Every structure is written in structure tokens, then in C-alpha cells.
């Protein structure tokens, strides 16, 4: 695991909440202030707020997907190999929404001049939504698999799935479980390393 993943895995629930909600809140304030000042200057300048909005969305997506990548990679590494979900599509499903946000912003700016581009946006957008739901599925199922070490049904991991879907509430319940599993994983490694050789 690299340092970024360890940072997310060790972070307390309130730290993840403050990071993601704080970035969103500060970004929204910046966008609102810039849109008010742009409207006051001229209507043409109002269209330029797409850049700060896109930057805020990309930053928020980066942190959110980084948190999911950290959880998914860690949980997959501690699940029994026979129960482990395949990482290939999970990795793709993390990268695609992050890249899509830039494509969306570029096409959204262009859609005012060419409405036909909206036909391109919809399938790309729905696939990005599918990828986000797959990320929720992967992390929630891997969390329960890591905790109980036996095959699970949707009923078993529906709680974490919906809690992570409704992020502002779910982070308070999900992150402590991640912290516990991470601490359990690190404690045996530390005791083995501390043994005289």
C-alpha cells in the first residue's frame, strides 16, 4: 500500500467527512462568489464559471475516488483468495468517472453551440453512473467479505452499500469498520517485525 492509501485507511470518519464535504463546500462558495461577480460584470463572463466548477468537481472526484480506491484495494487484499472479487473492472470503474468529468465539462461547454453533443453525453454519463454503483458494490461487498470470511448475498452487504451511497451519513459508520480492519491487519505485522530474529 502506498502512503495515500494508508492516509485514507487510517483517517477517522470525521476527517474523511471534513475532507470531502469541506472541499465541496469551499468549492461551492468559490463558484457562487465568482458567478455573482461574473453576473455583475457582464452576461458573457457568467459562462466562464464552468472552469472553477469543473476544477472543484474534479478535485472532489479525486478525493472521493481515492478513498474508494484505498478501501477497495485494502479490503481485496485481506479477503480470502477464494472469496476475493476481481480487481480489473474495479480499477477501470474508478478511473472512468474521473476521466469522464473532464469530458463532460468540455462537452457541456460545447453543448450550447451544438445540441447534438448531448447525444454523446447521455451514454457516457450513464456509464459513469454505472461505474460509481459498481465501486459501491465492490467496496461494500469486500468489506463484509473481509469481516465474516464467508460467501455473502446482497442482503448481507446492503447496509454498507446504501450507507456509502448516502455518503454524508455512511462515512460515520463505514470508516470505523475500515479503521478496525486496518488496525487488525497492521497489529500482527508490527508484532512479527518486533520479534527478535
Q: What residue spans do the PLM features occupy?
A:
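Membrane-interface helix-boundary motifs at transmembrane edges
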Residues: 8, 40-47, 76-88, 112-115, ...
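Membrane-water interface of transmembrane alpha-helices
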Residues: 62-77, 135-141, 174-175
Amino acid at each position: 500500500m502506498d502512503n495515500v492509501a494508508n492516509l485514507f485507511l487510517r483517517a477517522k470518519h470525521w476527517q474523511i467527512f471534513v475532507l470531502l464535504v469541506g472541499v465541496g463546500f469551499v468549492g461551492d462558495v468559490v463558484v457562487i462568489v465568482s458567478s455573482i461577480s461574473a453576473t455583475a460584470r457582464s452576461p458573457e463572463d457568467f459562462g466562464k464559471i464552468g472552469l472553477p466548477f469543473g476544477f472543484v468537481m474534479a478535485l472532489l472526484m479525486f478525493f472521493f475516488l481515492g478513498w474508494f480506491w484505498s478501501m477497495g484495494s485494502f479490503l481485496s487484499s485481506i479477503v480470502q483468495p477464494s472469496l476475493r472479487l476481481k480487481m480489473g473492472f474495479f480499477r477501470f470503474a474508478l478511473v472512468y468517472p474521473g476521466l469522464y468529468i473532464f469530458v463532460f465539462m468540455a462537452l457541456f461547454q460545447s453543448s450550447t453551440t451544438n445540441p447534438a453533443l448531448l447525444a454523446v453525453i447521455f451514454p457516457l454519463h450513464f456509464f459513469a453512473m454505472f461505474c460509481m454503483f459498481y465501486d459501491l458494490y465492490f467496496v461494500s461487498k469486500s468489506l463484509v467479505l473481509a469481516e465474516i470470511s464467508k460467501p455473502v448475498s446482497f442482503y448481507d452487504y446492503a447496509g454498507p452499500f446504501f450507507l456509502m451511497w448516502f455518503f454524508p451519513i455512511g462515512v460515520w459508520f463505514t470508516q470505523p469498520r475500515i479503521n478496525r480492519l486496518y488496525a487488525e491487519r497492521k497489529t500482527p505485522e508490527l508484532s512479527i517485525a518486533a520479534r527478535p530474529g
